[in-house]
Each structure stands twice: as structure tokens, then as C-alpha cells.
């Protein structure tokens, strides 16, 4: 090991909690990625750990090996390593993060799962709801678990993604479990509406005051939102965003509360 920089990076199997410790050590600024100097530090530590296991790490220059490494693991080629990409590199116990993402691999599936587990329509998944989510995930993946392990996974996910420490996960926090290319909610960052702005735009499209809009009205609303923010959106993107958001709807009726969860600045990131 190189000094005391990352005591858990020893390439033995990591528990979920140990994996989180490694992640937080290298994601020093807490932005959800390892990039730049963080990535360089991680790679140097990884090479040092590999030397300790007898893996030859002298064959190429550090720069060459970093390029090869990023080509293999940086799946969306953005020059950053995100949490699930790191889970593929480190021998994480049962690789629970990848297991999670396989369960909600697309934004549409994610929104379906959100609606199913946000049972009280609060706009949050609380610890007990998250526990049910993870239990179903593990059953679907045929992964054996006991109550203690389920509790550890629940608490670890909360520690990873509960950015404001309130013991519950908002939609924007929970969506960080999605691969970046599937996380359509990231597309709305910088376009979040205040409650007043949201109420005004919803009222404009809910012309009959029914309290809900349909998919055609949602189409128009999303186009309007993008145009006002001078952002471009393809027909395919619009279709995907609409489909994902409509998974929150009740029989094709998208109520104010469901859309507010997606478009408003709260819950805070």
C-alpha cells in the first residue's frame, strides 16, 4: 500500500460498507465521479495494491496503463469513473451495485420502480420502502441474503445517496443509481423550477383544472421547458423522457405531485 491514502484498497473482497469507504476516499469533492487528480490517485493506489498481490505493473508507463484502464472501464467514455464502473473494478461483495442497476437498468424501469416503492407518494423513498426495494431486487437476482445483510445494504445505499442526511432518498438522489447515459433526470439539471414556476407552467397545460395532464400535454410542456432554457432535444430524447415520466402516471393521468418530483428543485441534490 502507498502510505495511508486508502486503507481498504487491498483487492480482497470488499463488503458494501468498505466499498463505500473506498469510494468516498477517492471521490474527494463528492460530485459522484472519480476524475482528474482523484482518478490519478485512485489508479496509483490500484497499481500499488496490484503489486502487493504479485501482479506485474511495470510493463507500461502509468499514462499508457491509465488509457487502457479507462478504455476498459469507462463505459460511457466521459473520462470519469462513476460508482457502478468502480464496482466492476473492485471485488465488491456480491457486487450489489451492479445487481441494483440490472434491476432498474433503464430510466423507464427506474420510474416504474419508483412509483411502486414510493407508496405514500411523498416524493421520497424512506428506509423501510428502500428495504423492500432491495429485498425484491435480491430475490429477482436469486441472491441469498439474511436480515442482517439486507439491513447493511439498506444503510449503505442510504449513506451513499442520501446527500442531505435526512434518512430518505429523493428521486434525484435515487436516480444516481442509474448509469449516466440512462439518467434522464440529469438532463434537467440547471432547468429545475421553483414551486411558483412549476405551478404556473402546470396550470398553463392543465387547462381544464383537472389536476393532471396527459402524455401529449407533457410533450408540449417538455418542449417548452427546453426551448425556454435554450437547450436542444431530439424527437427520440423527447419520446424517451415522456415515456419515463409517464411511468409515474396513474392510468395515463400525470398528476401535479408526480411531475413536481421530476421538475422542481426539491428534493435537494
From Swiss-Prot:
The keyword Repeat appears for this protein: yes
SMART domains, A to Z: EFh
Organism of provenance: Gallus gallus
Annotated compartments: Synapse; Cell projection, Dendrite
Keywords (A to Z) from UniProt: Calcium, Cell projection, Metal-binding, Repeat, Synapse
Main location: other
Binding residues for Ca(2+) 2: 74, 76, 78, 80, 85
Residues engaged in binding Ca(2+) 1: 27, 29, 31, 33, 38
Family classification: Belongs to the calbindin family.
Gene Ontology biological-process annotations: intracellular calcium ion homeostasis; regulation of synaptic plasticity; synaptic signaling
Transmembrane regions: none
Listed name of the protein: Calretinin
Domain of life: Eukaryota
Role noted for this protein: Calcium-binding protein involved in calcium homeostasis and signal transduction. It plays a critical role in buffering intracellular calcium levels and modulating calcium-dependent signaling pathways. Predominantly expressed in specific neuronal populations, influences synaptic plasticity and neuronal excitability, contributing to learning and memory. During embryonic development, it facilitates neuronal differentiation and maturation.
Residues bound to Ca(2+) 3: 118, 120, 122, 124, 129
Amino acid at each position: 500500500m502507498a502510505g495511508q491514502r486508502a486503507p481498504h484498497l487491498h483487492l480482497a473482497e470488499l463488503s458494501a460498507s468498505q466499498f463505500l469507504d473506498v469510494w468516498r476516499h477517492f471521490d474527494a469533492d463528492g460530485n459522484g465521479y472519480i476524475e482528474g487528480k482523484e482518478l490519478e490517485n485512485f489508479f496509483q493506489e490500484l497499481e500499488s495494491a496490484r503489486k502487493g498481490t504479485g501482479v506485474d505493473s511495470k510493463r507500461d508507463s502509468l499514462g499508457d496503463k491509465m488509457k487502457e484502464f479507462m478504455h476498459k472501464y469507462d463505459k460511457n467514455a466521459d473520462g470519469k469513473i462513476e460508482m457502478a464502473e468502480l464496482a466492476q473494478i473492485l471485488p465488491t461483495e456480491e457486487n450489489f451495485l451492479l445487481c441494483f442497476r440490472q434491476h432498474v437498468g433503464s430510466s423507464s424501469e427506474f420510474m416504474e420502480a419508483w412509483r411502486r416503492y414510493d407508496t405514500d407518494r411523498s416524493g421520497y423513498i424512506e428506509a423501510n420502502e428502500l428495504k423492500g426495494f432491495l429485498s425484491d431486487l435480491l430475490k429477482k437476482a436469486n441472491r441469498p441474503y439474511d436480515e442482517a445483510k439486507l439491513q447493511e445494504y439498506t444503510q449503505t445505499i442510504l449513506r451513499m445517496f442520501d446527500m442531505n442526511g435526512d434518512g430518505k432518498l429523493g428521486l434525484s438522489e435515487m436516480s444516481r443509481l442509474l448509469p449516466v447515459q440512462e439518467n434522464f433526470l440529469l438532463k434537467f439539471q440547471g432547468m429545475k423550477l421553483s414551486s411558483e414556476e412549476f405551478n404556473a407552467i402546470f396550470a398553463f397545460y392543465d387547462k381544464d383544472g383537472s389536476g393532471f395532464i396527459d402524455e401529449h400535454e407533457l410533450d408540449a410542456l417538455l418542449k417548452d421547458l427546453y426551448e425556454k432554457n435554450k437547450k436542444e432535444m431530439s424527437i427520440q430524447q423527447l419520446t424517451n423522457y415522456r415515456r419515463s415520466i409517464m411511468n409515474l402516471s396513474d392510468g395515463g393521468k400525470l398528476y401535479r405531485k408526480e411531475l413536481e418530483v421530476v421538475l422542481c428543485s426539491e428534493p435537494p441534490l
